[in-house]
Amino acid sequence: MPCILYMDDTSCLIDLPTSLQFNKHILPTRTKPVVKPYLLPEKSTSDYENSGKGTVGQVLQSLQRVRRALQLRSLDDNQSTDKSHHVQFQDIVYRSNTSASEIHFQAENAPLVQWYSDIFKVLVKAPVIQFEDQCLQWLKMLNTIPPSYSFITIKSKDTVELGLEEIYQQCVQNDGASAIKLKLKGSKVITESSETNCRDSIYYIPARSSFIMGDVEKTAQILLEAIDGHLEKPKCIIIDPPWPNKSVARSSVYKVNRNLGYLKALPIQESLSKTGVVAVWCTNKEKYVNFVKKVLFKKWNLTLVSTWTWLKITAFGEPLFDVYSNMRKPWEQLLIGVTSEYTSVYSDKIPPTFTIIGIPDYHSRKPSLKPFISRWFNCSANESLPVLEIFGRSLTPNWITWGREPLLFMHELYWSSDN
C-alpha cells in the first residue's frame, strides 16, 4: 500500500503509519483515529489575527482540494454503477468500528480501499517499556563518563540479543539486506496496566539502518566519528526537537529541555553534505519559529526556502481542532533550510509551501519525509539517500537515527507480520 493517497503541487494526503513502513511484509499497527474534532475551552471565533491567518487559508484550501480530488476519483469509479454519486469524505478515508479492536475500512464507495487491507491491526494502548534495576544502574554509570567511540555491526541473523550497556552511546548498524530483530536484555514491556502481562523487548532493525542511543548533548562526537569512519555524510538532516510544552512536561511523555542552547551546539555543519537540506519540525509558538529561522539557520549558514504544514485531521476529514482557535492549532510546521551549494544545484525543487494532510496516531509521531526527500534531490524514490534524523524515535533503511529513544516505535508491538 502506498503511503501517499493523493498528491498535487501544493498538498498531499498521507497515511502516517504506512509512511514509516520499512518492509512490505511487516505492517504497521495503528491507534483508533479520532472521529470528532477536539473541543477547546474557548469560544469559536473567526477573528484569527496573530494566530496564523495565512496558514489557516492555506490548510483549508489544501483540505478542500484533497476532498474534491477524492470525490471526483470516486465518481469516476462509480460511473458504471447504479450507486449514488454523492460520496462523503469519511467514506473515502476510513471509519472506526468502536465496538471492535480493529479498524474496518468502508469499501462500498471508497476508491482508496484498493490500497488498504480490509483490516488493520490496532494497538489501542501504547506499551510501557521498563528496565531492570541492573540496566538502570548501567545507564546511571554510563551517563557519568564521557562516551568512547565504538561502531557495532549487527550480523545477519533472525534475532540478535544485546544488553543495553552494549549499545548505549554507541553507533549500531544493520548492514544487511533484510531487517533483524534485536532482543534487548534486561528490559520488559508491559502491555496492560498489570505487570503480569509482560514480554521481552524485541525491536526491528531495518536493513542498512543505523542508530545512536543517548543524549545528543553527550554523543555528538560519536556521530561525527561514525560519519568520518563508517557512514556516508547525510544529504538531509531532519530535526524534531522536544520543544518546551506545559502539557508534555506534565505528562512526562519524554524529556523536555527548556534551555534551547543545546540545539545551537548540534554539529549540523560538520555532518551535512555541501549540497544539503535541513528540515526542522516546530510548534506554532512564534518564539520557537523565530528561534529556528533567526538563530539556528543563521548559525548553520542555511537559507530558509520553505515552510511546510502538517495538518492533522479526524477520520471524517475534519481538522483536529478549530482552525480559528487562538489556543491550539491542528497543525505543526516544518521549516526547511538549504545550503548555498544546494540552491545552485537543485533550484526550485522544494515548494515554498506545502500541506501534508493526515490522521495522527501515537503521541508526537510525525509522518516520514522519505516520500518527499527524493524529490528534493531530483532522484528516484528507490535511490538510497543518506539521511540523519535527530531526536527520531523510529528507524528507516539507509538513515541514521540519533537521540534518546531511536528504537521506541520499532518495538515489535508497533508492527505485525503479514503471515
From Swiss-Prot:
It holds the Pfam family MT-A70. Its main location: cytoplasm. One of its GO terms (biological process) is mRNA processing. SUPFAM superfamilies: S-adenosyl-L-methionine-dependent methyltransferases (SSF53335). InterPro entries: MT-A70-like (IPR007757), SAM-dependent_MTases_sf (IPR029063). It is found in: Cytoplasm. GO terms for cellular component: cytosol. Keywords: Cytoplasm. One of its GO terms (molecular function) is mRNA m(6)A methyltransferase activity. Belongs to the MT-A70-like family. This is Uncharacterized protein C22G7.07c. The lineage of its organism: Eukaryota, Fungi, Dikarya, Ascomycota, Taphrinomycotina.
